[in-house]
Amino acid sequence: MTTLPFPLAEAPDALTEERGRKLFAGNTDFLKGVVAMDGLPPADRIEVCFAGRSNVGKSTLINALTGRKGLARASNTPGRTQEINYFTLLDSHYLVDLPGYGYAEAPLHVVQQWQALLKSYLQGRATLRRAFVLIDARHGVKAVDEEIMKLLDIAAVPFQTVLTKSDKVKGRDRDASLARTRKALANHPAAYPEIILTSSEKGDGIPTLRATIATIET
């Protein structure tokens, strides 16, 4: 049987799933919003970040992971929230919510400021172990997604693709979306070789993503 490039991540075994559940069932709190590098918290724990286009479902996914609906809040205006938001997972992890990219509603100076901060963060955060790049399963990889992937390649930060809203696409449409995503990822050396398929609404893939984060080593 031919092995597909960038296969879907398999569901974790019972022990690994429980490890992920415990990480996200503990104290999960918003720590701070950061607008400049000198505002970053101490680099004293494992750090993962979530990146994605505006309206990709990033805040909803973070809330599904933590089981807290109001923890991460989506901006009503795409491209306007330009803070790097830090959340603590127990005393061992930072979960970092990067601003949604897609700048149709944002002034040029805001776009430039955000791009500079993002580049500095990705290249200068030694404890950042993995980025999770969220892609809407209905639409696949867009040009702005390619831009963030290129930044991650340059910064040598491993990134893993998470397809969101998978419950909204079925059968051949889902297969086509996966094929397009795999083709795009083949051009990026920093791409982690598994894709996680999620639905925040249905809970699909949430245990897998929790377990993946819980097993990332220092």
Curated annotation (Swiss-Prot):
One GO cellular component term: cytosol
Domain of life, per lineage: Bacteria
Gene3D superfamilies in UniProt: P-loop containing nucleotide triphosphate hydrolases
GO biological process: division septum assembly
Record Pfam families: MMR_HSR1
GO molecular function: GTP binding; metal ion binding
Cofactor(s) listed: Mg(2+)
Coiled coil region boundaries: none
Family the entry assigns: Belongs to the TRAFAC class TrmE-Era-EngA-EngB-Septin-like GTPase superfamily. EngB GTPase family.
Its job: Necessary for normal cell division and for the maintenance of normal septation.
PANTHER family, alphabetized: ENGB-TYPE G DOMAIN-CONTAINING PROTEIN, MSS1/TRME-RELATED GTP-BINDING PROTEIN
Protein name: Probable GTP-binding protein EngB
Organism: Jannaschia sp. (strain CCS1)
Organism ancestry: Bacteria, Pseudomonadati, Pseudomonadota, Alphaproteobacteria, Rhodobacterales
Recorded name of the encoding gene: engB
